[in-house]
């Protein structure tokens, strides 16, 4: 009975780790057909972000330049000009396909992430007992650590998350999340998040040290400040 009680939380933890991957894989395959069909048959109005509009405009400017080049080389044989026109036409069709695929992927990723969040929330509520057991294990493990190890772990974690070299890591992580939700890459938004999010985390962490650690373990705070200095 004791082994069963210990096994269920571990099984629950494993399922929590692999469930998002399984949901993403399953729903991407099942929803892709329906979203593609809906976009191609019912979508009558085009919505473009500033980044997408700029990208498409640049592509059309390139095509326009090719057309101007076409006018400038009228002395070339008709077969050559015909080949050039066909190439421009194919490029235009490819541009439209890329635009449609970008929107389909954005809707697909957004739908999958919302569905995953709902399923994981329900799964967490249903597994409240297992979460309580896992939480007690974590608290017991942390309690048995020495103050020096705790201070070293906190210092290492803070340096990784909000240290001098952390902006590049935040840029990669925020860019990945931004892309995972299907949004077009935007350097201004990502740069703004990278410059503000670690600052917010740093403020929350200092408040946590002041309100929580000072109350439960003053010696840990002293060791942490000594190592940090």
From Swiss-Prot:
Protein name per UniProt: Potassium/proton antiporter CemA
Pfam families, per database record: CemA
InterPro entries xref list: CemA (IPR004282)
Membrane topology recorded in Swiss-Prot or TrEMBL: Multi-pass membrane protein
Main location: plastid
Record's keyword terms, sorted: Antiport, Chloroplast, Hydrogen ion transport, Ion transport, Membrane, Plastid, Plastid inner membrane, Potassium, Potassium transport, Transmembrane, Transmembrane helix, Transport
Function noted in UniProt: Contributes to K(+)/H(+) antiport activity by supporting proton efflux to control proton extrusion and homeostasis in chloroplasts in a light-dependent manner to modulate photosynthesis. Prevents excessive induction of non-photochemical quenching (NPQ) under continuous-light conditions. Indirectly promotes efficient inorganic carbon uptake into chloroplasts.
Family membership noted in the UniProt record: Belongs to the CemA family.
GO biological process, one term: potassium ion transport
Gene: cemA
Bilayer-spanning residue ranges: 7-27, 106-126, 189-209
GO-annotated molecular function: antiporter activity; proton transmembrane transporter activity
Reactions mediated catalytically: K(+)(in) + H(+)(out) = K(+)(out) + H(+)(in)
A single GO cellular-component term on record: chloroplast inner membrane
Subcellular localization(s) per the UniProt record: Plastid, Chloroplast inner membrane
């Amino acid at each position: 009975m004791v082994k069963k009680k210990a096994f269920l939380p571990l099984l629950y933890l494993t399922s929590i780790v692999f469930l998002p991957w399984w949901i993403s894989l399953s729903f991407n395959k099942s929803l892709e057909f329906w979203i593609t069909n809906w976009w191609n048959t019912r979508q009558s109005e085009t919505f473009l972000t500033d980044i997408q509009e700029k990208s498409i405009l640049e592509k059309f400017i390139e095509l326009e330049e090719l057309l101007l080049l076409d006018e400038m080389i009228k002395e070339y044989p008709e077969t050559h000009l015909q080949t050039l026109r066909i190439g421009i036409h194919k490029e235009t069709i490819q541009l439209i396909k890329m635009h449609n695929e970008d929107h389909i992927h954005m809707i697909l990723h957004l739908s999958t992430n919302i569905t995953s969040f709902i399923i994981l929330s329900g799964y967490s509520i249903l597994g409240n007992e297992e979460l309580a057991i896992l939480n007690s294990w974590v608290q017991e493990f942390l309690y048995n650590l020495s103050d020096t190890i705790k201070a070293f772990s906190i210092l290492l974690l803070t340096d990784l998350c909000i240290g001098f070299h952390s902006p590049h890591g935040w840029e990669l992580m925020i860019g990945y999340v931004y892309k995972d939700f299907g949004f077009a890459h935007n350097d201004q938004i990502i740069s703004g998040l990278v410059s503000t999010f670690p600052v917010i985390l740093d403020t929350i962490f200092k408040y946590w040290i002041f309100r929580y650690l000072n109350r439960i373990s003053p010696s840990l705070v002293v060791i942490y400040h000594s190592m940090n200095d």
